Amino acid sequence: MAVQQNRKTRSKRGMRRSHDALSASALSVEANTGETHLRHHVSPDGYYRGRRVIAPKHGDETEE
């Protein structure tokens, strides 16, 4: 196994880890229904950018 030659300081460790932070997912609000969804993804009711692109699997919603 590899063993480090010199100990890394807290500063160097922190500088390396500074890029590891997670950011929150960007959410969009659908214009027609007001439902939230991930960017560039179809909303749960089948709308994308104001148009219905997928019919819902459960048949209880009416077509508009």
Curated annotation (Swiss-Prot):
Keywords: Ribonucleoprotein, Ribosomal protein. Residues 7-16 have a biased composition (Basic residues). It comes from the Bacteria. This is Large ribosomal subunit protein bL32. Belongs to the bacterial ribosomal protein bL32 family. Residues 1-64 are annotated as: Disordered. GO terms for cellular component: large ribosomal subunit. It comes from Methylococcus capsulatus (strain ATCC 33009 / NCIMB 11132 / Bath). One of its GO terms (biological process) is translation.
